[in-house]
Structures are given as structure tokens and as C-alpha cells.
């Protein structure tokens, strides 16, 4: 990773680091560390970044939404501090193209993997915190998460269970995921849709909702719950 690449990343982030080693580490996946033994990878920074992000978002919500209950604030925070939101940030700054990883990881789709990009965002937050301090990283987080915060407050975030399901299944190789509309009922202005999700010709989830998209998301969520339960 040369200094021109680092400058490009810094411009995308809106942060210019004093310690570029922190930025390099934040962008280094563990697979790269396994391939190049001297490389420090980003898992420890990710651990710290998660806590920094939680603190800054919690503090912001606490100070700015005094009419919200603890339960409401917790729900809002869970929509902001989650893998899907982190992935949205990663996409905006084209983070996937800068992450250092092994050739094997890249060949199997690692550069597009949601979890890898989300983890890298948390690692970058930690790197900014260590390099610039809590005041700077607070402003950095609020700048990049502003749109997501507003959507969470206005209840406009739809959890993308379909993408998460695809991400989970990609770990085991190529699979065929199909969403099948089985029926709908109710008047046109309040129609309810029912959908199955079929994975490699096997029924794995059922969902319903007042749009086809909502029904598919709920079917994907049920499939995720089943699959993640099997992995425990």
C-alpha cells in the first residue's frame, strides 16, 4: 500500500493521519496477516472501534433525544450500530477496494463480503480515535453516520436480511436462493403477501408482509434464524 493509495483513502475518509501505520493496520484483514507473517491485522482495532462507535452514538442519542425512553434509545442505537449500517458506510467510501487480504480470500469473494467491510469500518474508527482523539472521532462518526442516524430516528431503516442470508451462505460456496410468492390476500389497498425462501430446492423460511419486499425480508430472517441456530 503506497503513499498515493493512502492519500486517496484519507481523502475519501476526510481524515489525514499522523500515524499511517494505524490506517494500514485498520485496512488489513486477518487472511493477509496469515499470508504475510509480519503484517499486523485489524481485529484488535475492530474490537476497540466497536466500543468507540457505541459510546459516541449512545452519547449523541442521550444528549439530543431527551424525550426518548431507554428502550427507544436502545432500539434506535441497534439500527445505527449494526453490520448493515457499517456496510453502507463502507460502500460510500469504496472501502472494499482498499482492504488488504490474501489472494485466496479475494478469490472467494472476500473483497465484497459484508462482514469484512463492516469490520474494517470499525477498525478505521479505532484508528481515527487513536490518532486524533475522542473529540475528532466523535465528529468523524457523526459526519459519516448522519444519514443513518436520521433514518433510524424516523424509523426508515429496513434491515436487509436477504443480503445477510446471501452473505452467510456464500461462506460455503455457491448456492441457489429463490423467493417464491405463494399467495396474497386482502383488498388492493391493504394486500398482504406470503413468500417462501427456497435454498437449493429446500424450503428454509416463510414470511409475510404488506409488500413483496417485506415478505421476502421476513422469509430471509426466518431462514437466517434457522441457519444460525444450526451453527451454534
UniProtKB/Swiss-Prot annotation:
Residues 6-133 form the RNase III domain. Residues 160-229 form the DRBM domain. Its cofactor is Mg(2+). Homodimer. It is found in: Cytoplasm. Digests double-stranded RNA. Involved in the processing of primary rRNA transcript to yield the immediate precursors to the large and small rRNAs (23S and 16S). Processes some mRNAs, and tRNAs when they are encoded in the rRNA operon. Processes pre-crRNA and tracrRNA of type II CRISPR loci if present in the organism. It holds the Pfam family Ribonucleas_3_3. The gene is rnc. It catalyses: Endonucleolytic cleavage to 5'-phosphomonoester. The active site is at residues 50, 122. GO terms for cellular component: cytoplasm. Belongs to the ribonuclease III family. It comes from Clostridium beijerinckii (strain ATCC 51743 / NCIMB 8052) (Clostridium acetobutylicum). One of its GO terms (molecular function) is rRNA binding. Keywords: Cytoplasm, Endonuclease, Hydrolase, Magnesium, Metal-binding, mRNA processing, Nuclease, RNA-binding, rRNA processing, rRNA-binding, tRNA processing. SMART domains: DSRM, RIBOc. Its EC number is 3.1.26.3. GO terms for biological process: mRNA processing; regulation of gene expression; rRNA processing; tRNA processing. This is Ribonuclease 3. Mg(2+) binds at residues 46, 119, 122.
